[in-house]
């Protein structure tokens, strides 16, 4: 009976390797101009797409790791601001600093769902061919940060 207590209760499906990211359109966070995914994914071997919100406490916890990844300069960071109030999101970035190269808005959550996200925060490591290499459900922590760096170092 007690063995069942050790099993995780949250179901997170495993990511199948080499799934290609589909093209999408979104609004650029700061300007509200429409932007195509082809414009986001240029001139980098790797991209980290991070889905976040100002109201998400674990998003605050992972923020220092996003800043560290920005400083590594081996990956382009793309933020997707999920179901958020723009004023609160701007305050979040102002307070904690902006690690992202680009941010797009996802006010109703459809873009995040299309990408295969189940909540916030979630992150996708994507290669230059727009293939998803790694999916991180939940906040980036030391373990997932180290795994991302390991993947980036294997190819550089």
Positions of predicted regions on the chain:
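N-terminal targeting signals for export/organelle localization
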Residues: 1-27, 156
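Short, ordered coil/turn segments that flank beta-strands lining enzyme active or ligand-binding pockets
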Residues: 29-31, 128
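Short active-site neighborhood of thiol/selenol oxidoreductases, capturing the structured segment around
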Residues: 36-60, 66
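Hydrophobic beta-strand anchors of alpha/beta hydrolase catalytic cores
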Residues: 48-49, 77, 123
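Structural microenvironment flanking redox-active thiols in thiol-disulfide oxidoreductases
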Residues: 60-97, 107-113
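Thiol/disulfide oxidoreductase modules built on the thioredoxin-like
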Residues: 94-99, 106-156
């Amino acid at each position: 009976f007690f063995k069942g207590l050790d099993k995780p209760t949250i179901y997170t499906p495993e990511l199948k390797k080499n799934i290609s990211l589909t093209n999408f359109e979104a609004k650029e966070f700061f300007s509200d101009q429409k932007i195509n995914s082809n414009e986001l994914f240029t001139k980098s071997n790797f991209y980290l797409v991070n889905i976040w919100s100002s109201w998400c406490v674990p998003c605050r916890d992972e923020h220092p790791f996003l800043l560290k990844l920005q400083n590594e300069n081996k990956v382009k960071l793309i933020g997707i601001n999920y179901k958020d109030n723009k004023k609160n999101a701007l305050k979040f970035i102002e307070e904690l600093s902006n690690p992202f190269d680009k941010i797009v808005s996802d006010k109703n959550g459809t873009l995040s769902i299309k990408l295969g996200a189940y909540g916030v925060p979630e992150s996708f490591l994507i290669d230059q061919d727009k293939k998803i290499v790694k999916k991180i459900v939940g906040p980036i922590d030391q373990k997932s940060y180290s795994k991302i760096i390991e993947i980036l170092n294997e190819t550089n």
